[in-house]
Curated annotation (Swiss-Prot):
CDD domains: Transaldolase_like. GO terms for cellular component: cytoplasm. One of its GO terms (molecular function) is transaldolase activity. It is found in: Cytoplasm. Its main location: cytoplasm. Keywords: Cytoplasm, Pentose shunt, Schiff base, Transferase. The keyword Transferase applies. This is Transaldolase. It comes from the Bacteria. PROSITE patterns: TRANSALDOLASE_1, TRANSALDOLASE_2.
Amino acid sequence: MQEFSLWCDFIERDFLENDFLKLINKGAICGATSNPSLFCEAITKSAFYKDEIAKLKGKKAKEIYETLALKDILQASSALMPLYEKDPNNGYISLEIDPFLEDDAPKSIDEAKRLFKTLNRPNVMIKVPASESGLEVVSALTKASIPVNATLVFSPKIARKTAQILAKEAQKRAVISVFVSRFDKEIDPLVPKNLQAKSGIINATECYYQINQHANKLTSALFASTGVKSNTLAKGYYIKALCFKNSINTAPLEALNAYLLDPNTEYQTPLKITEIEAFKKELKACNIDLENTAQKLLKEGLIAFKQSFEKLLSSF
């Protein structure tokens, strides 16, 4: 069984050349993730891409994006490679496929295989949304021995289904990215104070149980969206609450740094299934169903990544 580990949910050229290396060298992180929104934020706001973008002028927008993004992914891969070589459970960087291909499994599979072949690094994970068509992609990629990060998982049912697919096919490392804080942002305005800032953690815990029950030893739960979205919570709140054995937490820098500075970090015991069910009954009394919320958040997440990718491409 793997222990709890931290990954960094951020990617940007200057960061990769400086603080990213420091975090790795001091043993703070052992992996990293990226997504279309992070690349949009980095490439459109950082000055470190401007000269390269200027040199690529005249090329198609997606070609410019891939040139920039793959360079960052390769740099992250190189920095993490010593960790991977020491322990192939660690040292991964994730790259997401074009979000506009999300509902086209054959094209998604082709793009994922092309990107993985182009990068030619064993510690690169291809990130695929766990939508209905996305799970077809997950299955195909695992059959092709490509490490997979199944992302935008909000539902325990989808967590179980994804874990079962990976258990059948996965010959390489895989993670199932369970999104956390978006639940609380959605639900907290609708519930009394004693139920606030709990839905994301409790839903993620149920997903964690499903993954550990149905996945193989190469697959781990990865808690994502663990930056706080409320000023009333400590920055490392979600990392600390979900510090479970055999799990990973990928966090934005603010949350990551807060957690690393916290002297009181230790393994947490996940809530019992009976406690989870009791909480869900309390939500039901407020006319809230976590499964319905999960479906809504998945749709919103898919749209948000498409919007970010479109914004990035149009900036070229």
